[in-house]
Regions:
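Sec/Tat signal peptide C-region and signal peptidase I cleavage site
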Residues: 14-18
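Single-residue recognition of alpha-helix boundary sites
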Residues: 13, 58-62, 206-207
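Alpha-helical substrate-recognition element adjacent to the catalytic core
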Residues: 19-43, 48-167
């Protein structure tokens, strides 16, 4: 009898555990073809930087920020301290710079899924002080997540859900979404999360596993197939003239004629 009880328990555990799947795509069309007409109650969540858009200058690109943090860490600074130190400068650069859309089909996909009555929102590591510039950047590309009206209990002061964008104030994804899910009055049966970094996709998968939410994590690599924006030498020239951020083309011209000295 004990054997059969154990067997039944194991079978129940296996069938009741939410499914998890990780896929890699080159284009947003691959996401649409598989999930646009999914009847499940799901949330579709987009990362912001390098998924919805990327900085249009080497200096405003996320890779400059990441490489700068790495540089400080080689000097013995902790990752958190480097992030906190560089953030005000990164934010000032965002206010001066421009952005480039990754794929023109993304706004159309968002609108279609919203029109199906599904919840679609964005999730960024960005700090709360970056809310205004983030909203301006999204609006410039006609991207809106304001339809994502998710009733929740009071959120912790470290995170914010503003106009359909979850601001996590974190170096790595996961903790903010965990807090956000904790505050929800009802959870979805499935979460579809799109990010350009696989480690972020895996982190969100762990959050969903803890909540027993079915999960499809999508590693979105479209930006890798676009002409590169971040070029270290160009970023150095732009940093020299950062009081008024110049384009990559202007920086390349200065570099060619050695006028950056």
């Amino acid at each position: 009898m004990r054997f059969w009880l154990v067997l039944v328990f194991l079978c129940f555990s296996q069938t009741s555990e939410a499914s998890q799947r990780i896929v890699t795509v080159k284009t947003i069309h691959e996401v649409a073809s598989d999930n646009l007409y999914d009847e499940t109650d799901y949330w579709l969540i987009f990362d912001v930087d390098d998924v919805l858009f990327e900085g249009a200058e080497a200096l405003s690109h996320s890779l400059w920020f990441e490489r700068s943090i790495q540089g400080m860490r080689t000097l013995g600074t902790s990752e958190q301290e480097a992030w906190e130190t560089l953030y005000p400068e990164w934010l000032a650069i965002q206010r001066q710079g421009s952005i480039r859309q990754i794929e023109a089909a993304i706004p159309l996909l968002i609108t279609k899924v919203q029109n199906l009555g599904k919840t679609v929102f964005a999730y960024s590591e960005r700090k709360l002080c970056a809310q205004d510039i983030t909203m301006e950047q999204l609006a410039s590309l006609n991207l809106s997540f304001e339809k994502a009206l998710l009733p929740n209990t009071k959120l912790p002061p470290t995170i914010s859900f503003t106009k359909g964008v979850l601001f996590g104030s974190e170096i790595h994804k996961g903790p903010a979404l965990q807090l956000f899910l904790d505050a929800q009055t009802a959870l979805p049966k499935r979460i579809i999360y799109i990010d350009n970094e696989k480690y972020n996709v895996l982190r969100i998968g762990e959050v969903c596993k803890q909540k027993n939410i079915s999960y499809l994590g999508i590693v979105y690599t479209a930006a890798k197939y676009l002409p590169p924006i971040y070029l270290p030498d160009i970023a150095k020239v732009q940093y020299t003239f950062r009081q008024k951020l110049i384009s990559n083309e202007a920086a390349a011209l200065l570099l060619r004629h050695r006028l950056d000295k």
